Amino acid sequence: MPTVEHFEISADDVERAQKFYKDVFGWTMQKWSERENLGQEYWFFETKDDKGSPGIGGGMMKRQDPSQGITNYVTVSSIDEYSSKIEQSGGKVMVPKTKVSDMGFIAVCLDSENNSFGLFEYAAQSKQ
């Protein structure tokens, strides 16, 4: 069963947002230099529970659109297959399958209630 594996936080002021999440949750962020090749700065971070066990990984970037908030990414075996399922079930694919460096592919969708979420497919799984 596909599961949420990554979430992305959009921020108007990335430094301020990083400080907020560090002060509140202890999350430290590491810049992903490879993403700069796509014309966008991006930071990764890992979450952990109170005992130090790893949680869902996250990322942060500068907000591109006023309506952009937090996006949860569900890892799937095939974005093409799940995009079709989404549309057949009353959802919409807003950003079609897009390559993200050598890691894999993403797509951004809306569910039947207009909530946005992302799909992620590892490159090793992809037939492109």
Language model segments and positions:
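Short, charged/polar, Gly/Pro-enriched secondary-structure boundary elements
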Residues: 51-56, 115-117
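Core segments of cupin and vicinal oxygen chelate
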Residues: 2, 8-54
